[in-house]
Amino acid sequence: MTERPKIRVLLIDNHPLVLDGLKAVLETFDHIEVAGTAGLAQTGLEIGRQILPQVVLMDINMPKLSGIDAIELFRNELPQARVVMLSMHDSREYISSSVMHGAAGYILKDVSTDEIVSAIETVAGGGTYFSSGVFDALMGERVEEGSDPLTPRERDILGLIVAGRSNKEIAETLGITSATAETHRKNLKKKLGITTTAGLIRYALDHGIVSKVG
């Protein structure tokens, strides 16, 4: 049996109890390596330059340099690192701001260990991840009647894209072929005038039309 490659993770949180607890839990998983920890975003950036993490799990509210402001610094200096925001806040303002700055994921602090691990695995594989509580918050605000140009099926596709699903996973969830899922993805971009998956995610957040499917 082939051993799973380790995912190098950097943890950043200004609460020592949270930081130590998260580190202890993640270290129980053989395929996750907590390569470094920091109590400040700036310190985390300095450590990141040395350890070159694949995933940065970072608190959103920190002194001196906030997690949101730090996202762009990580993207500029450590382009291989994927940033996941860890927060107590489920407001669209925080979520949208994080995505606009380049976060690959957003999870709430009350999620299970399994969900944190899923987030790490998903973003390390190039996807995006938003915890179930974040979906609930997004679903609480809908666009005005007639202002949404997407069909119900397109909204389902968009919701699955935001959840980081591959074309194969989208196909399995909706009972379509992978080729059809890819066509839907391309059509969404063309219809909305968006060229990247990140742009689709921003659109979904800004318009409050994310669907939780499956």
UniProtKB/Swiss-Prot annotation:
One of its GO terms (cellular component) is cytoplasm. Keywords: Activator, Cytoplasm, DNA-binding, Phosphoprotein, Plasmid, Transcription, Transcription regulation, Two-component regulatory system. InterPro entries: CheY-like_superfamily, Sig_transdc_resp-reg_C-effctor, Sig_transdc_resp-reg_receiver, Tscrpt_reg_LuxR_C, WalR-like. The modification 4-aspartylphosphate is found at residue 59. Residues 143-208 form the HTH luxR-type domain. One of its GO terms (molecular function) is DNA binding. This is Transcriptional regulatory protein MctR. It comes from Rhizobium johnstonii (strain DSM 114642 / LMG 32736 / 3841). The lineage of its organism: Bacteria, Pseudomonadati, Pseudomonadota, Alphaproteobacteria, Hyphomicrobiales. The gene is mctR.
